[in-house]
Amino acid sequence: MNSIKNHLMCEEIHKRFHLHPKVRKAMESIEREVFVPAPFKHFAYTLNALSMQAQQYISSPLTVAKMTQYLEIDHVDSVLEIGCGSGYQAAVLSQIFRRVFSVERIESLYLEARLRLKNLGLDNVHVKFADGNKGWEQYAPYDRILFSACAKNIPQALIDQLEEGGILVAPIQENNEQVIKRFVKQNNALRVQKVLEKCSFVPVIDGVQ
């Protein structure tokens, strides 16, 4: 049963960012508390990003809602997430997309996220321990690709794994700031469709740990 606290959190998000009905329903369906480390459970329904292990963070629920909506979610089937983290973003995506694939480079985070998602019965979410810069070629092409970490550029491997006409949303490092950009794939290349807003994400890092 969805908690009143989670509902009120979604109300607060909606006041700041007008939510697509599908995004609001997805956010209300997933209890953020499940993904928050025990010392921070009392902050689970605030709009703050919260610390996890390995110098990583669970994103603000406002950010999760925005990133989900920026994907343009109507009439889509599959999404690839780069940077699973706690699994919260993937869980929200699972309420909208038929198939969710998420790659995590930190093994301890991968194991915890996979267990959380399994315990929630989210059978349409598939998580892989791997270098996110290489994507997940096995199930490509994807209708959407979402970066949950900040990239300096988009690797060719991920462009290749995006469906022609598909959308990729990513925080991009530009000089001394990060901005969220939405790209569309046209003629096998990415074109910036829209610069959405400034942001603050942990960086994409090569390799695994």
Curated annotation (Swiss-Prot):
Disulfide pattern: none
Active site positions: S59
CDD domains: AdoMet_MTases
Keyword terms of this UniProt record: Cytoplasm, Methyltransferase, S-adenosyl-L-methionine, Transferase
PROSITE patterns on file: PCMT
GO molecular function: protein-L-isoaspartate (D-aspartate) O-methyltransferase activity
EC id: 2.1.1.77
BP terms from Gene Ontology: methylation; protein modification process; protein repair
Top enzyme category: transferase
Entry GO CC: cytoplasm
Signal peptide boundaries: none
InterPro entries according to UniProt: PCMT, SAM-dependent_MTases_sf
Locations listed in the record: Cytoplasm
UniProt cross-references to SUPFAM superfamilies, sorted A to Z: S-adenosyl-L-methionine-dependent methyltransferases
Reactions mediated catalytically: [protein]-L-isoaspartate + S-adenosyl-L-methionine = [protein]-L-isoaspartate alpha-methyl ester + S-adenosyl-L-homocysteine
Function statement: Catalyzes the methyl esterification of L-isoaspartyl residues in peptides and proteins that result from spontaneous decomposition of normal L-aspartyl and L-asparaginyl residues. It plays a role in the repair and/or degradation of damaged proteins.
Family that this chain belongs to: Belongs to the methyltransferase superfamily. L-isoaspartyl/D-aspartyl protein methyltransferase family.
Protein name, as recorded: Protein-L-isoaspartate O-methyltransferase
